[in-house]
Amino acid sequence: MWNIAVAESLTTQHVAELKRLYLDGTKHSCYQNVPRFMSRHIDLSEKLQPLWRDDVPRLDLVREYFDFSHLASVVDVGANTGYFSLSLAFDHPNLEVTAIEGHAGHADFIAEVADLAGLGNIKVVNQYVDQQTDPRLLDSEVVLHFNVLHHQGVDNPDNIDSTDRFFPVAAQALSRAHQEGRRLVLQMGFNWGGDKKQPIVALDDDLGKLRYLERLVEAARFEIRDLALPVLNEGGDRYRYVIYPFEHIRRD
């Protein structure tokens, strides 16, 4: 559990500041779930639509795929308000976690929670990852790259003017994470900058998305080993990820 002394030290000012940072009204505020260890003590959770945006299944996925108790380091690219990085740092005190987030308010939120929870194993870097990023910033065994790549050229200084120029910029940005033996967990949106009027691949073209993703990953010098696909529960209100070898997907 969260350190009792930490919980007792939460003042009204602490709560107000956390709410201000989490609910700041910017493009990606209230975007992630709040880490469970914190939500027990502070009610910041917004009503997130679990069929559209839910971080719990993705965290369950990476926990199923990796044994973090035997890993030394992980980097969370585009960490937002830190659901993944804070949760992993809290659950695995020996794991060195780096949360990279370009929005200053979100980065401050992660740092504030980490400080209050006494998490000395997490480093917060207020920076966007793009094609100019120093690869040493991403030095780790595992890189989490969840749903941020499609913002290349929109939410960072690359400033490209069309989806036609997106591919080489995104591939170069993703390649900054490449290192022999490093594992990358990649999820990519297909609306450029989150704009439904500017699809990178048509919404209903699932095969096209898969082919695009394969080309992009190869251009970044990675190789897809497995693919995780969402499966709805019997009630149809939540989903989980099921992992398939990528070669089976390609063959079928």
Language-model features, listed with the residues they occupy:
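Class I SAM-dependent methyltransferase Rossmann-like catalytic core
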Residues: 35-57
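Conserved class I S-adenosyl-L-methionine
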Residues: 70-80
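Conserved SAM-binding motif I beta-strand of class I
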Residues: 96-101
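A short SAM/SAH-binding and catalytic strip from SAM-dependent methyltransferases
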Residues: 141-164
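Conserved beta-strand signature within the Rossmann-like core of class I S-adenosyl-L-methionine
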Residues: 170-171, 177-192
